[in-house]
């Protein structure tokens, strides 16, 4: 590979002073190596360096989009059946490529360089779009805390009676009324238990009976 670049650089240096020697260097290297070792911007027939003075460049564009082709594309998008002639015409439109024509003025021969077809470009574009969608991170959906608590309560209460559902206060909310009621009940039960233990066996109060105390809990 380094020898190829060296010979090409030497040929470009000799093209002004000795064009025949430059062509001979390019021909000698191409004849002793593989077919794919041709030089860029060089005529493959006479090994003349193609510059603006000794070459002519033309561009043959792809087949244009006609109304008939547009109708066939619309039918194909709707998954309609196409005849053999219509399918062949549509395939010819998709496989059409732009052609770069370079004519060497020394040997009067034309070299064709084909571009990429429409089907290849469409596939490349679709693959790039899918790769971009896979690479983009998916942001999780944010839900409000009230809606989340509501969803949890509804899911937990399915198949249960309303009496079995337990409501827990959310964080940040206090229940002073419930706490005061629980404290008064505890004091009352403690006083009843103290009176029940301190009374003698002779004078028993029916209101301070042990069964009555347990039933009041």
Curated annotation (Swiss-Prot):
PTM sites of type Phosphothreonine: 130, 139
Modified sites of kind Phosphoserine: 126
Database matches in InterPro entries: DUF4674
Region (Disordered): 131-190
Entry keywords, A to Z: Phosphoprotein
A Pfam family: DUF4674
Biased composition, class Polar residues, residue ranges: 149-182
Family: Belongs to the UPF0711 family.
Identification of the protein by name: UPF0711 protein C18orf21 homolog
Species assigned in the record: Mus musculus
Lineage, opening ranks: Eukaryota, Metazoa, Chordata, Craniata, Vertebrata
């Amino acid at each position: 590979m380094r020898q190829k670049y060296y010979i090409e650089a030497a040929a470009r240096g000799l093209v002004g002073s000795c064009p025949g020697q430059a062509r001979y260097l390019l021909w000698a290297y191409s004849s002793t190596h593989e077919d794919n070792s041709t030089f860029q911007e060089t005529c493959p027939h006479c090994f003349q360096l193609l510059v603006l003075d000794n070459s002519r460049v033309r561009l043959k564009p792809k087949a244009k989009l006609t109304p008939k082709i547009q109708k066939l594309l619309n039918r194909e998008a709707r998954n309609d059946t196409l005849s053999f002639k219509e399918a062949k015409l549509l395939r010819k439109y998709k496989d059409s490529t732009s052609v770069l024509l370079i004519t060497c003025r020394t040997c009067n021969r034309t070299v064709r360089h084909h571009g990429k077809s429409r089907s290849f470009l469409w596939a490349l574009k679709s693959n790039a779009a899918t790769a971009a969608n896979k690479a983009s991170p998916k942001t999780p959906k944010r839900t409000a805390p009230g809606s989340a608590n509501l969803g949890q309560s509804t899911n937990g209460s399915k198949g249960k009676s309303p009496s079995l559902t337990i409501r827990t206060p959310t964080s940040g909310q206090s229940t002073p009324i419930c706490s005061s009621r629980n404290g008064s009940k505890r004091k009352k039960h403690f006083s009843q238990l103290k009176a029940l233990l301190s009374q003698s066996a002779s004078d028993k109060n029916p209101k301070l009976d042990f069964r009555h105390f347990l039933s009041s809990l």
